[in-house]
Amino acid sequence: GVRDGYIAQPHNCVYHCFPGSGGCDTLCKENGATQGSSCFILGRGTACWCKDLPDRVGVIVDGEKCH
């Protein structure tokens, strides 16, 4: 299946990006999502949000620190 979420690097770390750049859209589409955008997460900074991301691709788990 698919779901929306903040795409994760290994160890529950976000992909940082610059608002207004196409980086998140490209990253998300390369991983099978339909689109991507940058969103601000409190305590983590700007991160990539993907729409319709396949289940096989990791997303950020709430409450777990980047390590």
Swiss-Prot record:
One of its GO terms (molecular function) is sodium channel inhibitor activity. Signal peptide: none annotated. GO terms for biological process: defense response. Disulfide bonds join 13-66, 17-39, 24-48, 28-50. SUPFAM superfamilies: Scorpion toxin-like. Keywords: Disulfide bond, Ion channel impairing toxin, Neurotoxin, Secreted, Toxin, Voltage-gated sodium channel impairing toxin. The keyword Secreted applies. Expressed by the venom gland. It is found in: Secreted. Its main location: secreted. It comes from the Eukaryota. GO terms for cellular component: extracellular region. Residues 3-67 form the LCN-type CS-alpha/beta domain. Belongs to the long (4 C-C) scorpion toxin superfamily. Sodium channel inhibitor family. Alpha subfamily. Binds to sodium channels (Nav) and inhibits the inactivation of the activated channels, thereby blocking neuronal transmission. Has the structural arrangement of an alpha-helix connected to antiparallel beta-sheets by disulfide bonds (CS-alpha/beta). This is Neurotoxin Os3.
